[in-house]
């Protein structure tokens, strides 16, 4: 097979994994990124004052049920055992999340067994809501007014900048309650943290003789003609110069502060009350429990609407955005020799494991398209 010249826009997980897969098959891969570092939003770095490893763009915990993906990251990093145990400050008390038997008993001042807790939550739920349409209705139906208002209402307003009565029920897909004392935030089979950080992991993925990386480099659409194929992991609307307007995202602001000793005793503390302006405080040294640090680095995290010069984090995907997305998809689907990938390229919220799985699949589809002399699709996943 003749070696192809590949341009990849973005040096996060999507771009790095696709690039590595194609480089290993002998293709010449050029990866560019407008930032001054690799890793996208999973970038981490040592704090100069405390030497704590900081998740610069907010907490990233690796969790998956996909064994192929787990094996892949273990090839490029030593994965340390890590369980994400989130706490929440509500009405002057600290509770465990997700809501579990301990949370229920503490909140209602009871000593329920699992079956008693099930009965209690069923009794609290609003059974008159037969077909919940909104986030609020879904929560009231599932868990009732007290737990909803304590743990979900204020936090959701801060996170999304909207009333829960304006958000779709699908955001709260299933009963967010456990009737045991399990306080592991994730249900996945494989969970961990790269011992030397995500930046080092992605550096390992990019370490191949057929990969060239240029940082602080903007993508110029006209450059496409110099390459056989482009994989674009930047924002879909940006690719088209925002000609129909900007797709809606939430962005995050982080207020960093340092502390001597332990600030909060856990990695993540949610603040559920709408009266507290931030959504959570992250204490970064708790993401690396195998290390010892006297000092501590903390982030207060604030969520707001993403504006022109902000970093887009969470795609909103409400009705208005989906109509706008459709316009951009109608442009994209007429393209040739380009594939839109990743969180920004497909306007979907993706965890790291899904991003890697989709990148592996995309590379496979491209290699197969070459073998079979078929056109490469513009999207390798469903984006609607």
Swiss-Prot record:
Catalytic reactions on record: UDP-alpha-D-galactose = UDP-alpha-D-galactofuranose
Gene3D superfamilies attached to this UniProt entry = NAD(P)-binding Rossmann-like Domain
Annotated FAD binding sites: 14, 33-34, 41, 60-61, 219, 343, 350-355
Instruction: Please state the pathway this protein functions in, per its UniProt record.
Output: Bacterial outer membrane biogenesis; LPS O-antigen biosynthesis
GO terms, biological process: O antigen biosynthetic process
Cofactor(s) needed by this chain: FAD
Query: Signal peptide span per the entry?
Result: 1-23
Judging by the UniProt lineage, the source's domain of life is Bacteria
What remark does the entry make about the cofactor?
A: Binds 1 FAD per subunit.
Q: Which Pfam families match?
A: GLF (PF03275), NAD_binding_8 (PF13450)
The cellular component terms of Gene Ontology attached to this UniProt record, alphabetical and capped at eight, are: cytosol
Enzyme class of the recorded protein, top EC level:
isomerase
Any one GO molecular function term: flavin adenine dinucleotide binding
Q: Which UniProt keywords apply?
A: FAD, Flavoprotein, Isomerase, Lipopolysaccharide biosynthesis, Signal
EC number(s) per entry:
5.4.99.9
On whether DNA repair is a keyword of this UniProt record, the answer is: no
Q: Which residues bind UDP-alpha-D-galactose?
A: 84, 151, 156, 160, 185, 270, 280, 314, 349
InterPro entries linked: UDP-GALP_mutase, UDP-GalPyranose_mutase_C
| Subunit and partners | Homodimer.
Q: What does this protein do?
A: Involved in the biosynthesis of the galactose-containing O-side-chain polysaccharide backbone structure of D-galactan I which is a key component of lipopolysaccharide (LPS). Catalyzes the interconversion through a 2-keto intermediate of uridine diphosphogalactopyranose (UDP-GalP) into uridine diphosphogalactofuranose (UDP-GalF) which is the biosynthetic precursor of galactofuranosyl residues.
Q: Give the family, as the similarity comment puts it.
A: Belongs to the UDP-galactopyranose/dTDP-fucopyranose mutase family.
* Protein known as: UDP-galactopyranose mutase
């Amino acid at each position: 097979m003749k070696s192809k010249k590949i341009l990849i826009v973005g040096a996060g997980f999507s771009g790095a994994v696709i690039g590595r897969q194609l480089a290993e098959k002998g293709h010449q891969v050029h990866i560019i990124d407008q930032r001054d570092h690799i890793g996208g939003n999973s970038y981490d770095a040592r704090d100069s004052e405390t030497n704590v490893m900081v998740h610069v763009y907010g907490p990233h915990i690796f969790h998956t049920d996909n064994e192929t993906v787990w094996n892949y990251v273990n090839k490029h990093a030593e994965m340390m055992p890590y369980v994400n145990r989130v706490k929440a400050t509500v009405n002057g008390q600290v509770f465990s999340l997700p809501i579990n038997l301990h949370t229920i008993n503490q909140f209602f001042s009871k000593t329920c067994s699992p079956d008693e807790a099930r009965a209690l939550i069923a009794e609290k739920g609003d059974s008159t809501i037969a077909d919940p349409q909104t986030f609020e209705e879904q929560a009231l139906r599932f868990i009732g007014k007290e737990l909803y208002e304590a743990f979900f209402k204020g936090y959701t307003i801060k996170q999304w900048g909207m009333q829960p009565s304006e958000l779709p029920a699908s955001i709260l897909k299933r009963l967010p309650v456990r009737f045991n004392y399990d306080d592991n935030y994730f249900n996945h089979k494989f969970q961990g943290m790269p011992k030397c950080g995500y930046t080092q992991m992605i550096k390992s993925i990019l370490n191949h003789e057929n990969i060239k990386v240029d940082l602080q480099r903007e993508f110029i659409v006209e450059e496409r003609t110099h390459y056989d194929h482009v994989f674009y992991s930047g924002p879909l609307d940006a690719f088209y110069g925002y000609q129909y307007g900007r797709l809606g995202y939430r962005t995050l602001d982080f207020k960093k502060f340092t502390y001597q000793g332990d600030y909060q005793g856990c990695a993540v503390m949610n603040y559920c009350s709408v009266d507290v302006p931030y959504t959570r405080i992250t204490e970064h040294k708790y993401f690396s429990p195998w290390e010892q640090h006297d000092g501590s680095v903390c982030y207060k995290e604030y969520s707001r609407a993403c504006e022109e010069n902000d970093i887009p984090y969470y795609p909103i995907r409400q009705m208005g955005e989906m109509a706008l997305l459709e316009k951009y998809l109608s442009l994209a689907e007429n393209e040739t020799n380009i594939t839109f990938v990743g969180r920004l390229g497909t306007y979907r919220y993706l965890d790291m494991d899904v991003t890697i799985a989709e990148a592996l699949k995309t590379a496979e589809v491209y290699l197969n398209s070459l073998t079979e002399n078929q056109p490469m699709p513009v999207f390798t996943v469903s984006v609607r």
